[in-house]
Amino acid sequence: VTEEGKVGGDQFVLASGSWSAQLAKGLDVNLPLKPIKGQMCRLKLDDHFFDYTIHGMMTYIAPWKEGNGFVVGSTMEDKGFDSSIEGKVIDTLIERAAEILPCIKDASLIESWTGLRPAANDLMPIMGKSWRYKNLFYSSGHYRNGILQTPNQADYMVSIIKGLRKNEIPEFSPSRYNL
């Protein structure tokens, strides 16, 4: 049910990121999923540019798609649906990035933001057919790399829904949670 009324269909995919568990409650399904907050920022450096990602222990620095900018990320915080940006946390990210790449100390902060990543209890995606509802499929819990893997996830889900794949990947199957 939406603000515009009911939406009909033959098959449904529950793929609503960090909000999937809330929607699943409407089906009397306890989806073992919670949001994990990630804070990050974008910096600008006029004299330095690179086109690859640098990974540190707790931080990464990635080139921004436009200009001489970098994205610095990111945190993993179990704070529910809190999407506030915390200046001290952003400062810590920048300090960690400067330990990896000292020229970051001269960078200007352009913007900062948060994202809520859907994490299943075992940190593995929940993808496949529901055993409770014959026309329901799950595609959620992709956590930190979900957006990067979207094309592969879509191909996998299409193969499941169309019956082109005989077996689900057991580590991703909703059956591991009796869904």
Model-based region annotation:
Residues V1-T2, V72, S139:
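Generic recognition of long tandem-repeat/solenoid scaffolds
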Residues T2-Q11:
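Core beta-strand elements of the Rossmann-like FAD/NAD(P) dinucleotide-binding domain
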Residues E3, K65, N152:
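Short, ordered coil/turn segments that flank beta-strands lining enzyme active or ligand-binding pockets
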Residues Q11-N135:
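Active-site substrate-recognition segment that forms the wall
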Residues L101-L179:
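C-terminal catalytic lobe of FAD-dependent flavoproteins
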